[in-house]
Regions:
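Gly/Pro-enriched, hydrophobic low-complexity segments
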Residues: 69, 134-224
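Short, basic/low-complexity N-terminal boundary segments at the transition from targeting/disordered tails
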Residues: 33-40, 109-117, 157-170
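Flexible, processing/modification-adjacent segments and terminal tails
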Residues: 11-20, 80-153, 226
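Positively charged n-region of N-terminal signal peptides that target proteins for export
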Residues: 1-3
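N-terminal leader/targeting segments and the immediate start of mature chains
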Residues: 6-50, 54-60, 88, 92-97, ...
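Short, exposed beta-strand/loop patches in secreted or surface proteins that constitute
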Residues: 27-29, 51-56, 73-75, 126-135, ...
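Mid-chain, structured segments of secreted extracytoplasmic proteins
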Residues: 58-94
Length: 227
C-alpha cells in the first residue's frame, strides 16, 4: 500500500487536467437531456422516505420527496451553484452542493472544466494550491484545495480511476460525499449514494434504486446505424 501511494505521488495531475478529464465524463451520457433517479431520502434521524431526483441538463436539479415540498436548484455555467428554491435544510444543502457535479452534461465542452472549477471555488476550495492523494470508501482520490487529512479546509476530491467527483467540503464544514459509482441502479455514470455530513454526523442521505432516461453514446450510435 505504501508503495502504491509512493507511485501515485510521483505524478499528480494539475487541477486543469483533473477538471478537463472530469468534464469529459459527460460524453458517456450521449444526448441525454433528462434523467430521473428514484430512491430513498433520509434526513437526520427522520425515517427514510421515497424520493426522486430529477436532472435536466445542464445544471437543473429537483428533488421530490414523498409527503414533502419539492426543492430545486437551477444554475448556469457562470454560476453553477445557481438559485435554490424550497424549504431550507440538509436536503436542500445536499442538492445545492451536488448539482454542479452531477448535472454538468450539456455545458459546451470548452466551458465545462471552468464550470467545475467555479463550483469548487464557490465552495471555498483553493484549487490552485495543488493536489494531494487520499482514499474515500476504498478508492483512491485526488484532493484539490487542502491537505487530505485537514477536513477543516474547503476541498474537492476526484476519484482517480473514473475521474468522477467524489467529495466536496465547503466553507462552514458541510461535507458532501458521492459514493458507489459504477452500479446499474444509478446507470453506472451517477453515484448510487449521496451523503451530506455536518459536524461529524450524517445529516442527509439519498440512495438511488433506479435510473431512467439515460441514453449512452454507444446506445445512440447503435440506434443511428439502424436508421
Amino acid at each position: 500500500m505504501r508503495l502504491l501511494f509512493a507511485l501515485l505521488l510521483a505524478y499528480i495531475p494539475s487541477a486543469d487536467s483533473l477538471f478537463k478529464h472530469t468534464a469529459q465524463r459527460a460524453r458517456a451520457l450521449g444526448r441525454t437531456r433528462e434523467v430521473t433517479l428514484s430512491g430513498t431520502l433520509a434526513v437526520n434521524d427522520e425515517p427514510q422516505r421515497n424520493a426522486q431526483l430529477l436532472l435536466r441538463f445542464p445544471l437543473q436539479c429537483r428533488l421530490e420527496v414523498e409527503g414533502g415540498q419539492p426543492i430545486s436548484v437551477k444554475g448556469t455555467a457562470q454560476n453553477p451553484e445557481g438559485v435554490a428554491e424550497g424549504p431550507s435544510g440538509p436536503a436542500l444543502r445536499l442538492l445545492q452542493m451536488a448539482c454542479p457535479f452531477i448535472a454538468y452534461r450539456g455545458i459546451p465542452a470548452a466551458d465545462a472544466p471552468q464550470a467545475l472549477r467555479v463550483a469548487a471555488l464557490a465552495a471555498g476550495a483553493n484549487v490552485g494550491a495543488g493536489a494531494a492523494v487520499s482514499r474515500l470508501a476504498d478508492r483512491v482520490a485526488y484532493v484539490l484545495g487542502a491537505a487530505p487529512r485537514d477536513p477543516s479546509s474547503p476541498q474537492l476530491w476526484i476519484y482517480k480511476d473514473i475521474n468522477a467527483p467524489a467529495r466536496l467540503i465547503a466553507q462552514g464544514g458541510a461535507d458532501l460525499r458521492l459514493l458507489q459509482y459504477g452500479t446499474p441502479a444509478a446507470a453506472d455514470w451517477f453515484p448510487r449514494v449521496f451523503e451530506l455530513w455536518t459536524g461529524g454526523r450524517l445529516a442527509a442521505r439519498f440512495e438511488v434504486l433506479e435510473a431512467k432516461g439515460v441514453r449512452g453514446g454507444a446506445q445512440e450510435e447503435e440506434e443511428d446505424s439502424e436508421e
